[in-house]
UniProtKB/Swiss-Prot annotation:
It comes from the Eukaryota. The N-terminal region is required for binding to PP1, the central region is required for binding to glycogen and the C-terminal region is required for binding to glycogen phosphorylase, glycogen synthase and phosphorylase kinase. Transmembrane segments: none annotated. This is Protein phosphatase 1 regulatory subunit 3C.
Length: 223
């Protein structure tokens, strides 16, 4: 006997295509950076010695450069630019030739005498007249700036004078006045024919002082 069959047909949707991508591909940026075109200019390197120049520059420093403070050096430079006023000195004696009779008498008696003297800035300039008692002669100034604790002999220069006769000779001198000098004193020594003759202003010596320090003679030896 024929049987009855029932058929149930199930229709499923077609399979969807699957795409596989690696994790690295999913992290790649979507923007691509723009590249700049290469610079057509080339860079050249040239060393100094190729141009005839020195490869190194050397500067030498002294120890004083590191020892001195910059501020001290700057202040010293400013002080050097400050104008300084020169001190004024006054002679403590009258010009010897002011009393010409006494001047001639002393020249005859002592054979040596201060003739002229004047202060010229930071020095004292003058002339000395001596009697010509020999061919070889020497005239010096004996000077002291500290009351004869120390003294110095300053040679004088012979002056050739054709207007005078041969009985006298003249010598010139220029005595410096160092910075800080307040008083100075000098006398004159004339050496000729093995003998010494002195002009010491009759035992007082010739002296001068800086203005504002007072007039007075320094105590010391007299020749």
């Amino acid at each position: 006997m024929p049987g009855d069959f029932s058929v149930c047909v199930c229709i499923s949707p077609p399979p969807q295509p699957q795409f596989h991508c690696s994790p690295a591909d999913s992290l790649r940026p979507c923007l691509v950076p723009t590249r700049r075109p290469p610079d057509p200019r080339k860079k050249n390197v040239v060393f100094a010695d190729a141009l005839g120049l020195a490869l190194t520059s050397v500067r030498h420093f002294t120890r004083a450069f590191f020892d001195e403070e910059p501020l001290v050096l700057a202040l010293a430079s400013l002080r050097a630019l400050r104008p300084l006023s020169s001190p004024t000195y006054t002679l403590d004696f009258s010009p010897p030739t002011q009393d010409y009779g006494r001047y001639r008498e002393q020249l005859t008696r002592k054979l040596v005498c201060l003739e002229q003297c004047a202060v010229q800035g930071a020095a004292v300039a003058g002339t000395v007249r001596v009697r010509n008692v020999g061919y070889e002669k020497r005239v010096t100034l004996r000077v002291s700036y500290d009351g004869w604790c120390n003294h110095y002999d300053l040679p004088c220069t012979y002056l050739f004078d054709t207007r005078r006769g041969g009985d006298t000779d003249s010598f010139s001198f220029r005595m410096p006045l160092p910075v800080g000098t307040e008083r100075a004193e000098f006398c004159i020594c004339y050496w000729c024919a093995g003998e010494e003759y002195w002009d010491n202003n009759d035992g007082k010596n010739y002296s001068l002082h800086k203005e504002g320090k007072g007039k007075g003679y320094l105590q010391g030896p007299y020749w």
